[in-house]
Amino acid sequence: MASLGRQVPEWHRLMALSWACLARQTCHFRKEKKMSPSLFCKLTTVPSRGNFQEFSSVRPKKYMQEPEHRTRLVPCLHEEQRTCMGSESLELERAISSLQDMGFAEAHIDSLLNIQPSVHPQQLLDIISELLLLGLNPEPVFMALKKNPQLLKLSATQMKRRSSYLRKLGLGEGKLKRVLSVCPKVFTMRQQDIDNIVKVLKEKCLFTVQHITDILHRCPAVLQEDPSELEYKFQYAYFRMGLTHLDIVRTDFLQYSIAKVKQRHIYLERLGRYQTPDKKGQTQIPNPSLKNILRVSEAEFLARTACSSAEEFEVFKKLLDQEEEESESHMSEEEEEEEEEEEEELP
């Protein structure tokens, strides 16, 4: 009994210490606002009746407080979205103001901003500024971008590089207006393709530098032609029709398709209304001007130049197509025979 009497105060002291420890840990939990693994440990106390009982230090979930950063997450996201939208709106307003200062009409501004919606407004302004520096007015710039939206995907560096290249070809200071209206891909096509055309005009056709500049300015469609077909067109004009280099440049001959040229030239030739000049450039009959052959409509060509009916010209075109098909077939057969002979000669 004496021993039991001494144990009772010890049990009460142990219980008091356990509750004090629990109170300190709970207070610490509230201050830190987070759960510590040590708080999940269960405390064992000895009550006065001598039975062991477990007390959990974890409070019910309904009393747990959500972390502060979670409660602030959604407002932060909304604030970032509002900031982003405000920044985009400000950039758009600045772009519209700049385009107005450049001289673009309101309708053009709306169209420009919708041509490539993914393009940043500042990049749009950079591209347009480069085109204006080449001597273009707002109207041709708008038409060029509308015909070739890929222009807006170029960087300012690429635009400056291509502009410098075109200036070297003599296409600066306002001459690009016609080039862009006819061939808006002049800025986006490969430079190697342009070089190939210039090389044919210079080395195969023997045009001067000034002639090449005039051709690119007056007939920009040649930039999109196949180099071999362009060379053939020149040879037809020079050898079959007897035209000089200056005639070809001044009459914009290279802008017409070879099919149209051959149809009208050969038709006049068979009617006896056109002759190929001799070595001295002379003919027995006066040839009609190229303007009356190529620059006029088909109806005017037949009425004033050929003095023929539309039915006769249609029959002639069908016959000419058959002749060319037979000629091509005959040429391919000759090429095959030559290849077979070469193979037989090989040991």
Swiss-Prot record:
Record note on domains: The MTERF repeats form a half-donut shaped, right-handed superhelix, where the concave side displays a positively charged path for nucleic acid interaction.
GO cellular component: cytosol; mitochondrial large ribosomal subunit; mitochondrion
Name by which UniProt lists this protein: Transcription termination factor 4, mitochondrial
MF (Gene Ontology): double-stranded DNA binding; rRNA binding
Localization in the cell: Mitochondrion
Chain positions of MTERF repeats: 142-172, 177-204, 209-239, 245-270, 290-318
UniProt region (Disordered), positions on chain: 321-347
Annotated source species: Rattus norvegicus (Rat)
Main location: mitochondrion
UniProt subunit comment: Heterodimer with NSUN4; this interaction may be required for NSUN4 recruitment to the mitochondrial large ribosomal subunit.
InterPro entries assigned: MTERF, MTERF_sf
UniProt keywords, alphabetically: Mitochondrion, Repeat, RNA-binding, rRNA processing, Transit peptide
Family of this protein: Belongs to the mTERF family.
